[in-house]
Design a protein with these regions (language model features):
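Short acidic/polar hinge/loop motifs at secondary-structure boundaries
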Residues: 1-10
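Extended, hydrophobic alpha-helical segments in both membrane/secreted and soluble proteins
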Residues: 3, 156-158, 254
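N-terminal, post-signal-peptide soluble/periplasmic segments
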Residues: 10-99, 166-190
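Short coil turns and loop connectors of transmembrane beta-barrels in diderm outer membranes
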Residues: 37, 129-130, 166, 246-248
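Transmembrane beta-strands of outer-membrane beta-barrel proteins
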Residues: 41-43, 133-135, 170-172, 250-254
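Flexible loop and strand-edge segments within Gram-negative outer membrane beta-barrel domains
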Residues: 52, 99-138, 142-149, 155-234
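Charge-patterned, long linear interaction tracts outside catalytic cores
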Residues: 228-232, 236-256
Length: 256
């Protein structure tokens, strides 16, 4: 939001200015600055809906039961009642409870979600022949289509340019950025391998450790309450001094 223009220097021009560091080209980003004129305020907001582009196709409940029956016949020589989902041995006791009640889980429903993304930007600027200024604050809130993958960013930017006299100008730009990311995200691999009859949460509301009981495949959501939120803060400041030399068309500029 605070970028005014982007330009690319290539070949000899980049090497002449930046030396060996510019041998592969240089990208120059010009941030916005104040302009002469009356003080004015600008507010922009963007709202968007985000959802997973594509889900992974997995077996449905009936396909899962047929698979367990085939595995029971081929691997354990099961037959008759042993292959019955309710009285047999092809699924665990906890899965039988859900099977009897007709309760199934699409584990990707817990991993993925549809979210609203918000981006707010507020800026003001103004100035006169001697002084120009600009300041802005923006806030981005992106909950993330994967559970716990939320990202929040607050950006505060300010710049001021001062023309001291006909041959000297100075300026200062500052920026503060605060970023916050979510905690532990679900394990998608564990989600797509789970039984559709596996238990999602126990009677206390806690995530069930191993939904299939007989497998060491953990609940993909079991770690999402872990305190793994991360915060990053950056502060940047740079200034410049522009000196017009007593030679027509020649000036000296120092940035720091």
């Amino acid at each position: 939001a605070d970028i005014e223009s982007i330009s690319v220097l290539k070949d000899a021009s980049s090497t002449a200015i930046y030396g060996a560091r510019g041998s592969n080209g240089v990208i120059l980003i010009q941030t916005k600055r104040g302009s002469q004129g009356e003080f004015h305020v600008t507010y922009k907001t963007k709202l968007a809906i985000a959802e997973p582009m594509q889900r992974i196709e997995t077996m449905g409940p009936n396909e899962f039961i047929r698979l367990k029956q085939d595995m029971g016949r081929l691997k354990n020589n099961y037959s008759g009642e042993q292959l019955d989902p309710l009285v047999g041995s092809i699924i665990s006791a906890s899965e039988k409870v859900n099977y009897a009640k007709g309760i199934t889980n699409d584990w990707q429903d817990y991993v993925f979600r549809t979210v609203f993304t918000m981006d707010h930007q507020l800026s003001f600027q103004g100035g006169n022949e001697k002084t120009t200024y600009m300041a802005s604050v923006s806030y981005l809130d992106n909950p993330g289509v994967v559970y716990n993958s939320n990202y929040q960013r607050t950006n505060v930017y300010a710049s001021i340019n001062q023309k001291m006299n006909d041959w000297l100008s100075v300026g200062l730009t500052t920026q503060f950025v605060n970023r916050e990311t979510g905690g532990a995200t679900p394990n998608l691999e564990h989600a797509i391998k789970q039984s559709p009859y596996g238990i999602y949460k126990d009677e206390t509301g806690a995530y069930y450790e191993e939904p299939m009981d007989y497998s060491n495949l953990p609940n993909p959501m079991k770690d999402v309450n872990a305190d793994q939120k991360r915060t990053g803060r950056n502060f940047m400041a740079n200034g410049f001094l522009d000196l017009k030399l007593p030679v027509k068309g020649l000036s000296f500029r120092s940035q720091f």
